Protein backbone atom coordinates (compact mmCIF):
# COMPACT_ATOMS: atom_id res chain seq x y z
CA UNK A 1 0.00 0.00 0.00
CA UNK A 2 2.81 2.41 0.89
CA UNK A 3 4.51 1.71 -2.43
CA UNK A 4 1.25 2.36 -4.28
CA UNK A 5 0.65 5.65 -2.47
CA UNK A 6 4.22 6.80 -3.10
CA UNK A 7 3.81 5.98 -6.79
CA UNK A 8 0.57 7.97 -7.02
CA UNK A 9 2.09 10.89 -5.12
CA UNK A 10 4.95 10.91 -7.61
CA UNK A 11 2.39 11.09 -10.44
CA UNK A 12 0.69 14.02 -8.72
CA UNK A 13 4.00 15.86 -8.48
CA UNK A 14 4.64 15.15 -12.16
CA UNK A 15 1.23 16.60 -13.04
CA UNK A 16 1.92 19.70 -10.95
CA UNK A 17 5.35 20.19 -12.52
CA UNK A 18 3.98 19.72 -16.05
CA UNK A 19 0.91 21.96 -15.83
CA UNK A 20 2.13 24.68 -13.45
CA UNK A 21 5.18 26.68 -12.46
CA UNK A 22 4.85 25.65 -8.83
CA UNK A 23 8.06 24.32 -7.25
CA UNK A 24 8.26 20.56 -6.76
CA UNK A 25 11.03 18.31 -5.40
CA UNK A 26 13.82 17.73 -7.89
CA UNK A 27 13.93 14.02 -7.09
CA UNK A 28 10.74 13.18 -9.00
CA UNK A 29 10.87 9.85 -10.79
CA UNK A 30 10.24 10.88 -14.41
CA UNK A 31 9.60 8.87 -17.54
CA UNK A 32 7.33 9.47 -20.56
CA UNK A 33 5.13 6.60 -19.39
CA UNK A 34 4.76 8.09 -15.91
CA UNK A 35 3.98 11.51 -17.37
CA UNK A 36 1.23 9.92 -19.44
CA UNK A 37 -0.18 8.32 -16.29
CA UNK A 38 0.04 11.68 -14.50
CA UNK A 39 -2.57 13.06 -16.90
CA UNK A 40 -5.25 11.49 -14.70
CA UNK A 41 -4.44 14.12 -12.07
CA UNK A 42 -4.98 17.10 -14.36
CA UNK A 43 -8.28 17.95 -12.58
CA UNK A 44 -6.48 17.68 -9.23
CA UNK A 45 -4.07 20.34 -10.47
CA UNK A 46 -7.16 22.42 -11.24
CA UNK A 47 -8.32 21.98 -7.65
CA UNK A 48 -4.92 23.10 -6.37
CA UNK A 49 -4.90 26.19 -8.59
CA UNK A 50 -8.47 27.06 -7.60
CA UNK A 51 -7.53 26.84 -3.92
CA UNK A 52 -4.49 29.08 -4.35
CA UNK A 53 -6.44 31.63 -6.38
CA UNK A 54 -9.31 31.61 -3.89
CA UNK A 55 -6.90 32.29 -1.03
CA UNK A 56 -5.28 35.09 -3.05
CA UNK A 57 -8.68 36.66 -3.80
CA UNK A 58 -9.86 36.52 -0.18
CA UNK A 59 -6.60 38.04 1.04
CA UNK A 60 -6.44 40.90 -1.47
CA UNK A 61 -10.14 41.82 -1.68
CA UNK A 62 -10.33 43.88 1.56
CA UNK A 63 -7.37 46.00 0.47
CA UNK A 64 -8.02 46.58 -3.23
CA UNK A 65 -11.71 46.12 -3.90
CA UNK A 66 -13.38 43.85 -6.41
CA UNK A 67 -12.19 44.85 -9.90
CA UNK A 68 -8.49 45.40 -9.07
CA UNK A 69 -8.42 42.09 -7.19
CA UNK A 70 -10.00 40.25 -10.13
CA UNK A 71 -7.41 41.80 -12.45
CA UNK A 72 -4.56 40.66 -10.19
CA UNK A 73 -6.23 37.26 -9.85
CA UNK A 74 -5.99 36.73 -13.61
CA UNK A 75 -2.34 37.81 -13.60
CA UNK A 76 -1.61 35.48 -10.68
CA UNK A 77 -3.26 32.62 -12.57
CA UNK A 78 -1.01 33.26 -15.56
CA UNK A 79 2.01 33.20 -13.28
CA UNK A 80 0.95 29.93 -11.65
CA UNK A 81 0.41 28.11 -14.95
CA UNK A 82 3.08 29.81 -17.04
CA UNK A 83 0.23 30.72 -19.42
CA UNK A 84 0.47 27.20 -20.85
CA UNK A 85 -3.22 27.07 -21.76
CA UNK A 86 -3.33 30.62 -23.12
CA UNK A 87 -0.34 29.72 -25.31
CA UNK A 88 -2.34 26.80 -26.71
CA UNK A 89 -5.32 29.08 -27.31
CA UNK A 90 -3.21 31.55 -29.29
CA UNK A 91 -1.32 28.90 -31.29
CA UNK A 92 -4.53 27.08 -32.21
CA UNK A 93 -6.20 30.30 -33.35
CA UNK A 94 -3.17 31.21 -35.48
CA UNK A 95 -2.89 27.74 -36.99
CA UNK A 96 -6.54 26.96 -37.67
CA UNK A 97 -7.38 30.36 -39.15
CA UNK A 98 -4.01 31.18 -40.68
CA UNK A 99 -3.22 27.95 -42.51
CA UNK A 100 -4.86 26.25 -45.47
CA UNK A 101 -3.52 22.70 -45.27
CA UNK A 102 -3.01 20.42 -42.27
CA UNK A 103 0.75 20.60 -42.67
CA UNK A 104 0.71 24.39 -42.80
CA UNK A 105 -1.58 24.64 -39.78
CA UNK A 106 0.68 22.40 -37.72
CA UNK A 107 3.72 24.40 -38.80
CA UNK A 108 2.11 27.67 -37.73
CA UNK A 109 1.05 26.17 -34.40
CA UNK A 110 4.65 25.10 -33.77
CA UNK A 111 5.99 28.60 -34.49
CA UNK A 112 6.89 30.43 -31.28
CA UNK A 113 5.82 33.78 -32.73
CA UNK A 114 2.24 34.93 -32.19
CA UNK A 115 0.13 36.15 -35.10
CA UNK A 116 -2.93 38.32 -35.54
CA UNK A 117 -5.46 35.56 -34.86
CA UNK A 118 -3.64 34.44 -31.75
CA UNK A 119 -3.38 37.99 -30.45
CA UNK A 120 -7.09 38.58 -31.00
CA UNK A 121 -7.96 35.29 -29.31
CA UNK A 122 -5.82 36.14 -26.26
CA UNK A 123 -7.25 39.64 -25.94
CA UNK A 124 -10.81 38.34 -26.21
CA UNK A 125 -10.18 35.56 -23.69
CA UNK A 126 -8.50 37.76 -21.08
CA UNK A 127 -11.08 40.53 -21.40
CA UNK A 128 -13.87 37.97 -21.18
CA UNK A 129 -12.34 36.48 -18.04
CA UNK A 130 -12.12 39.87 -16.40
CA UNK A 131 -15.72 40.75 -17.22
CA UNK A 132 -17.15 37.35 -16.30
CA UNK A 133 -15.16 36.97 -13.08
CA UNK A 134 -16.02 40.53 -12.03
CA UNK A 135 -19.70 39.75 -12.53
CA UNK A 136 -19.39 36.53 -10.54
CA UNK A 137 -17.52 38.37 -7.79
CA UNK A 138 -20.26 40.99 -7.59
CA UNK A 139 -22.79 38.23 -6.93
CA UNK A 140 -20.53 36.44 -4.42
CA UNK A 141 -20.06 33.45 -6.72
CA UNK A 142 -16.41 33.80 -7.74
CA UNK A 143 -14.96 31.19 -5.38
CA UNK A 144 -17.57 28.63 -6.43
CA UNK A 145 -16.89 29.44 -10.08
CA UNK A 146 -13.17 28.77 -9.64
CA UNK A 147 -13.86 25.49 -7.84
CA UNK A 148 -16.08 24.35 -10.71
CA UNK A 149 -14.29 25.75 -13.76
CA UNK A 150 -10.67 24.91 -12.99
CA UNK A 151 -11.03 21.13 -12.46
CA UNK A 152 -13.87 20.57 -14.95
CA UNK A 153 -12.29 22.48 -17.83
CA UNK A 154 -9.03 20.60 -17.38
CA UNK A 155 -10.68 17.20 -17.13
CA UNK A 156 -12.68 17.77 -20.31
CA UNK A 157 -9.62 19.12 -22.13
CA UNK A 158 -7.40 16.13 -21.40
CA UNK A 159 -10.24 13.74 -22.30
CA UNK A 160 -9.67 14.56 -25.98
CA UNK A 161 -6.70 12.20 -26.00
CA UNK A 162 -9.22 9.37 -25.66
CA UNK A 163 -11.02 9.91 -28.97
CA UNK A 164 -8.58 11.77 -31.22
CA UNK A 165 -5.25 10.78 -32.73
CA UNK A 166 -2.17 12.86 -32.05
CA UNK A 167 -1.84 15.04 -35.14
CA UNK A 168 1.95 15.25 -35.27
CA UNK A 169 2.83 11.91 -36.82
CA UNK A 170 6.56 12.25 -36.18
CA UNK A 171 7.63 13.02 -32.64
CA UNK A 172 8.66 16.65 -32.33
CA UNK A 173 9.73 16.46 -28.69
CA UNK A 174 6.83 18.66 -27.67
CA UNK A 175 5.61 18.62 -24.08
CA UNK A 176 2.41 16.82 -25.05
CA UNK A 177 4.09 13.84 -26.74
CA UNK A 178 3.96 11.85 -23.51
CA UNK A 179 0.20 12.39 -23.21
CA UNK A 180 -0.57 11.24 -26.75
CA UNK A 181 -2.03 7.85 -25.81
CA UNK A 182 -5.61 6.88 -24.88
CA UNK A 183 -6.33 6.26 -21.22
CA UNK A 184 -7.61 3.06 -19.69
CA UNK A 185 -11.39 3.17 -19.04
CA UNK A 186 -11.00 3.15 -15.25
CA UNK A 187 -8.47 5.99 -15.46
CA UNK A 188 -10.81 8.00 -17.68
CA UNK A 189 -13.64 7.39 -15.21
CA UNK A 190 -11.47 8.67 -12.35
CA UNK A 191 -10.46 11.68 -14.45
CA UNK A 192 -14.05 12.70 -15.10
CA UNK A 193 -15.24 11.89 -11.57
CA UNK A 194 -12.55 14.10 -10.04
CA UNK A 195 -13.60 16.95 -12.35
CA UNK A 196 -17.20 17.38 -11.20
CA UNK A 197 -17.54 17.34 -7.37
CA UNK A 198 -17.91 21.13 -7.09
CA UNK A 199 -20.76 21.02 -9.62
CA UNK A 200 -22.77 19.18 -6.96
CA UNK A 201 -22.84 22.42 -4.95
CA UNK A 202 -25.03 23.98 -7.63
CA UNK A 203 -28.82 23.83 -7.79
CA UNK A 204 -29.88 20.80 -9.82
CA UNK A 205 -31.00 22.79 -12.87
CA UNK A 206 -27.74 24.75 -12.92
CA UNK A 207 -25.65 21.61 -12.51
CA UNK A 208 -27.42 19.87 -15.38
CA UNK A 209 -27.02 22.92 -17.64
CA UNK A 210 -23.30 23.24 -16.88
CA UNK A 211 -22.53 19.55 -17.42
CA UNK A 212 -24.63 19.17 -20.57
CA UNK A 213 -23.34 22.40 -22.13
CA UNK A 214 -19.73 21.55 -21.31
CA UNK A 215 -20.14 18.11 -22.88
CA UNK A 216 -21.73 19.62 -25.99
CA UNK A 217 -18.79 22.01 -26.35
CA UNK A 218 -16.39 19.14 -25.76
CA UNK A 219 -17.83 17.12 -28.64
CA UNK A 220 -18.06 20.20 -30.87
CA UNK A 221 -14.36 20.89 -30.28
CA UNK A 222 -13.55 17.25 -30.97
CA UNK A 223 -15.09 17.48 -34.44
CA UNK A 224 -13.53 20.92 -35.01
CA UNK A 225 -10.05 19.59 -34.23
CA UNK A 226 -10.71 16.57 -36.44
CA UNK A 227 -11.80 18.79 -39.31
CA UNK A 228 -8.79 21.10 -39.17
CA UNK A 229 -5.83 18.82 -38.37
CA UNK A 230 -7.33 15.31 -38.25
CA UNK A 231 -6.52 14.99 -34.56
CA UNK A 232 -5.19 17.11 -31.74
CA UNK A 233 -2.00 18.63 -30.37
CA UNK A 234 -1.13 20.00 -26.95
CA UNK A 235 -2.15 23.44 -28.21
CA UNK A 236 -5.63 22.10 -28.95
CA UNK A 237 -5.93 20.90 -25.36
CA UNK A 238 -5.04 24.40 -24.16
CA UNK A 239 -7.64 25.88 -26.51
CA UNK A 240 -10.22 23.42 -25.17
CA UNK A 241 -9.42 24.25 -21.55
CA UNK A 242 -9.73 27.98 -22.11
CA UNK A 243 -13.03 27.81 -24.00
CA UNK A 244 -14.51 25.40 -21.45
CA UNK A 245 -13.50 27.70 -18.61
CA UNK A 246 -15.12 30.72 -20.24
CA UNK A 247 -18.29 28.76 -21.02
CA UNK A 248 -18.61 27.62 -17.40
CA UNK A 249 -18.26 31.19 -16.12
CA UNK A 250 -20.93 32.38 -18.55
CA UNK A 251 -23.34 29.60 -17.60
CA UNK A 252 -22.89 30.31 -13.89
CA UNK A 253 -23.70 33.98 -14.44
CA UNK A 254 -26.87 32.98 -16.27
CA UNK A 255 -28.10 30.38 -13.78
CA UNK A 256 -26.98 31.51 -10.31
CA UNK A 257 -28.99 34.08 -8.34
CA UNK A 258 -28.04 37.72 -8.72
CA UNK A 259 -27.24 40.11 -5.90
CA UNK A 260 -29.35 43.26 -6.10
CA UNK A 261 -27.42 46.05 -4.39
CA UNK A 262 -28.60 49.48 -3.26
CA UNK A 263 -27.11 51.22 -6.30
CA UNK A 264 -29.08 48.99 -8.66
CA UNK A 265 -32.30 49.60 -6.72
CA UNK A 266 -31.72 53.34 -6.81
CA UNK A 267 -31.16 53.24 -10.57
CA UNK A 268 -34.39 51.29 -11.10
CA UNK A 269 -36.35 53.74 -8.97
From Swiss-Prot:
Primary location class = membrane
Specify whether Phosphoprotein is a keyword of the entry.
Answer: no
> Where does the chain cross the membrane?
8-28, 41-61, 70-90, 114-136, 196-216
Q: How does it sit in the membrane?
A: Multi-pass membrane protein
- Stored Pfam families: CobS
- InterPro entries with a match to the protein in the record: CobS
Q: Which cofactor does it need?
A: Mg(2+)
Localization recorded for this chain is: Cell inner membrane
Does the keyword Transmembrane helix feature in the UniProt annotation?
yes
List the GO biological process terms: cobalamin biosynthetic process
Tell me the pathway. Cofactor biosynthesis; adenosylcobalamin biosynthesis; adenosylcobalamin from cob(II)yrinate a,c-diamide: step 7/7
Which Gene Ontology MF annotations are present? adenosylcobinamide-GDP ribazoletransferase activity; cobalamin 5'-phosphate synthase activity
Entry's Gene Ontology cellular component terms: plasma membrane
Report the EC code(s) recorded for this entry: 2.7.8.26
Its keywords, alphabetically, are: Cell inner membrane, Cell membrane, Cobalamin biosynthesis, Magnesium, Membrane, Transferase, Transmembrane, Transmembrane helix
What top-level branch of life does the organism fall under? Bacteria
Q: Which reaction does it catalyse?
A: alpha-ribazole + adenosylcob(III)inamide-GDP = adenosylcob(III)alamin + GMP + H(+); alpha-ribazole 5'-phosphate + adenosylcob(III)inamide-GDP = adenosylcob(III)alamin 5'-phosphate + GMP + H(+)
Q: What is this protein's function per UniProt?
A: Joins adenosylcobinamide-GDP and alpha-ribazole to generate adenosylcobalamin (Ado-cobalamin). Also synthesizes adenosylcobalamin 5'-phosphate from adenosylcobinamide-GDP and alpha-ribazole 5'-phosphate.
Q: Which PANTHER family match?
A: ADENOSYLCOBINAMIDE-GDP RIBAZOLETRANSFERASE (PTHR34148:SF1)
User: What family does this chain come from, according to its entry?
Assistant: Belongs to the CobS family.
Q: What is this protein's name?
A: Adenosylcobinamide-GDP ribazoletransferase
Q: Which gene encodes it?
A: cobS
